[in-house]
Amino acid sequence: QDNQDCVALVKDIIEKLRDLGDDLLLGPSTACIVNAAEERGIPSIRLSEGNLVQLGYGAKQRRIWTAETDQTSAIAETISRDKDLTKSLLRSAGVPTPEGRTVTSPDDAWEAAQDIGLPVVVKPIDGNHGRGVFINLYTQQEIEAAYAVAIDEGSEVLVERHIVGDEHRILVVGNKVVAAAKGETVWVTGDGKHTVQQLIQIQINSDPRRGTAEEHPLNPVRIDSAVELELARQQLTGDSIPGIDHKVLIQSNGNVAFDVTDLVHPDVASQVALAARVVGLEIAGIDLVAQDISRPLGEQNAAIVEVNAGPGLLMHLKPASGKPQPVGKEIANHLFPPGTDFRIPVVGVCGARGKTPVAEM
């Protein structure tokens, strides 16, 4: 019993130290930019207990907060949070987006789906991190259930035409694509013994890349209302025991990132850079659904579904597979192009007498 108490105490201390580290240390997105700047000799000053950091001195300084900078306008950020407005602006510039509209009730969602054509996507108009997003919905029951979840994640709900393909996150910095990652769906495979809930713990959450701390690129999977709806579409619950080799879809947008930066077609790069400019963001995370990112968008009926301000960088720093991308260096170089003067002269004068005349010389 004493040994068990000691183990429990040590685990508790370790957890508290991790929480303390999360509170005191810069987040990974901010840290990678600061580290890249310091490698060039650019000084940094932490301005808050959070992630607000000053790079450079005086009139030469720039400020960042994760992947947002002092040039990220409130207008552009507000536009990016409104998915329907963003799509309208992108369409006016010729950027491909999925057809859709906002809806006000479950019945309205079903009516919109019929007008657009099945299958559809249902998602909150101002949600984030993929919460409340449901894809490839066919039936009235699925669409109305998805509406009920999506409305809890945002102020309004958007119904869109479903685009066939994989979701990609493309990072644009200063009108240039610097990283791209492909998302993968999350599945478990039945063994005839364990429940879906147990399989999630065994096959998904055991991955060391999953955790609640900021250094973990992937979050643990929990059976929330979104997962419950996904399981219900497969006539399952968290307590169901799938048969041997029976694959069960857990999350359609599991945010498991695979680096595909080297595969981005020039047409794709041009379109996503244009999307960032239309919204007004110098640093943007563009969500694109495409079957093959190495082909032009027009050849595959692909579409841009979201433009995000202050995008997370961890998926590019620690992809599930593929090479990490130097996104911190790219952002630092954008803020301070090579050859830029980022310091101001600082001279200290000390002594017992004559300090003022010397300082005024």
Predicted segment positions?
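A long amphipathic alpha-helix within ATP-dependent nucleotide-binding catalytic cores
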Residues: 149, 153, 202-294
